[in-house]
Design a protein with these regions (language model features):
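Hydrophobic faces of well-ordered beta-strands that scaffold small-molecule active sites
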Residues: 15-19, 40-42, 70-74, 97, ...
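Glycine-rich, positively charged N-terminal anion/phosphate-binding segment
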Residues: 1-5, 20-95
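Alpha/beta enzyme core
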Residues: 34, 83-113, 122-198
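Active-site beta-loop-alpha junctions enriched in small/polar residues
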Residues: 20, 45-47, 75-77, 102-104, ...
Length: 319
């Protein structure tokens, strides 16, 4: 099993659940942990939200001791606020603090946060350096290939991040301009890997066990981050671990296992978020879990009417 060390945190394996707003909440992270993910990334949290004691931010900071090691991801652009808020939350049970420099969402970018930071190398250094000095836990950074095709600077930014004291860097092989469209450029991940000595985690288009293996072979990356490829597919982690052990990818889960996992996911949602929110948030997950299954289109038409666990259970009998 290929372990991965990030600062003083030793991961049992090098497969990482990437941070996704509205997706990598506590229930979903627990499912991915059960399937063997080596590191779980939380939904991104606003450093300003912590500063202003935003109640929605507090719910995003929930961590279950069973899911550790877990990475808490901040977004922000003020070195003072980000570093001070990192210090404020340091006693919580997360293992690693990540700084988001990849989010492409317009309102984040307009604030000079997320992927907008890639246009400001000086601020990148100040932000990472201040945060590294403020806390004892390892600090990592998630970046993109660049802001747009005219500004491909992942290698330059990764070097600055390393110089500022970060313990690892994750690289998504798309520009901000691409959002999630087109193809991820794995070549840029290889270039970053050659340019820095801290661990490099590759990200982008890893939708199956085969793709994760191909990324590692093509880029030499130390870890593989799986984000959208894990939506409705927590089994991707157990598949990869099985491949490492045996050299073959196992069969995909059958319909019954998918159904049972959806119901367990729904129970966790209700446990942590209550019936109303838990079931509503479960709807998108059901669409992902059932993609490609016989009868899935009909089920997706009806999922938005589901209001309770019993209704969900009843609906899933049609699969």
């Amino acid at each position: 099993m290929k372990q991965l060390k990030i600062g003083n945190v030793l991961l049992e394996n090098s497969y990482v659940l990437g941070p996704m707003a509205g997706v990598t909440d506590l229930p979903f992270r627990l499912l991915c942990k059960e399937q063997g993910a080596g590191l779980l990334c939380m939904e991104m949290v606003s450093a300003k939200g912590i500063f202003y004691n935003n109640k929605n931010t507090e719910s995003l900071l929930q961590i279950n001791p069973e899911e550790v090691p877990v990475s808490l991801q901040f977004f922000g652009s003020d070195p003072k606020i980000v570093s001070e808020m990192a210090k404020r939350v340091e006693e919580r049970p997360f293992s690693i603090l990540d700084i988001n420099m990849g989010c492409p969402v317009p309102k984040v970018v307009r604030n000079g946060e997320g992927s907008a930071l890639m246009k400001n190398p000086k601020l990148v250094y100040e932000l990472v350096s201040a945060t590294v000095k403020a806390i004892k836990k390892p600090v990592t950074v998630k970046i993109r290939k660049g802001f747009d095709d005219e500004h491909i600077n992942a290698v330059e930014i990764a070097k600055i991040i390393e110089e500022a004291g970060a313990a690892a860097v994750a690289v998504h092989g798309r520009t901000r301009e691409q959002y999630y469209s087109g193809k991820a450029d794995w070549e840029i991940i290889r270039q970053v890997k050659e340019a820095v000595s801290i661990p490099v985690i590759g990200n982008g288009d890893v939708t199956s066990g085969e793709k994760a293996i191909a990324m590692r072979e093509q880029t030499g990356c130390d870890g593989v981050m799986i984000a959208r490829g894990a939506q409705g597919n927590p089994w991707i982690f157990s598949e990869l671990l099985e491949y490492e052990r045996t050299g073959r990818l196992p069969d995909r889960p059958d319909v019954e296992e998918i159904k049972q996992t959806m119901l367990r996911h729904a129970r966790l949602q209700i446990e942590y978020k209550g019936d109303f929110t838990g079931i509503r948030e479960m709807r998108k997950h059901v669409a992902w879990y059932t993609k490609g299954l016989h009868g899935a289109a009909r089920l997706r038409d009806r999922i938005n009417q589901v209001e309770s666990y019993a209704e969900l259970e009843n609906l899933l009998t049609s699969l």
